């Protein structure tokens, strides 16, 4: 049984009405933007939030941080997970937490929230989506949640699995 959902480390943050409204389905890759968390800190000068349309037919509500070097970087789920400490230092998805905090700090200034609050909001939105699929699999196969262990694969496994396991009370 395979089910697909557009949530991963590169999933971009959607901002509407001055707050996080969604995560994904567009990714940094689709938008052709670097992840904030995989960017050198020295590139994060004078950060300002801009809202873009990753593809021509998308709405302009995906957050990027535009910097003094003329480049802009996507705010991503990987950035949020790194800031919150869910990604181990030696993991493929581990990045530059300082850069991510600078980028998310620009969003915090715009929204009147804190960096940690915003990261948790983004993770909660994304994991609610993933959690619904896990709940459906549990129901479809009549599984005992106490016997389940979540296992992730790919570069985004540590971005998704630890937070999802914690949120759902399932081992990982």
Annotate each PLM feature:
Residues 1-172:
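N-terminally biased helix-coil "hinge/interface" segments that flank
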């Amino acid at each position: 049984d395979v089910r697909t959902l557009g949530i991963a480390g590169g999933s971009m943050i959607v901002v509407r009405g001055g707050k996080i409204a969604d995560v994904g389905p567009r990714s940094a890759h689709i938008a052709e933007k670097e992840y904030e968390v995989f960017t050198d800190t020295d590139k994060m000068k004078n950060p300002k939030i801009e809202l873009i349309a990753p593809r021509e037919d998308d709405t302009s509500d995906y957050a990027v941080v535009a910097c003094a070097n003329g480049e802009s970087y996507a705010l991503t789920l990987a950035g949020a997970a790194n800031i919150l400490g869910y990604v181990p230092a030696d993991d493929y998805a581990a990045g530059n937490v300082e850069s991510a905090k600078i980028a998310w700090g620009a969003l915090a200034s715009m929204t009147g929230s804190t960096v940690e609050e915003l990261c948790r909001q983004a993770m909660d939105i994304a994991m609610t989506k993933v959690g619904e699929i896990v709940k459906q699999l549990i129901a479809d196969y009549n599984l005992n949640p106490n016997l389940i262990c979540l296992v992730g694969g790919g570069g985004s496994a540590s971005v998704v699995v630890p937070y999802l396991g914690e949120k759902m009370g399932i081992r990982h």
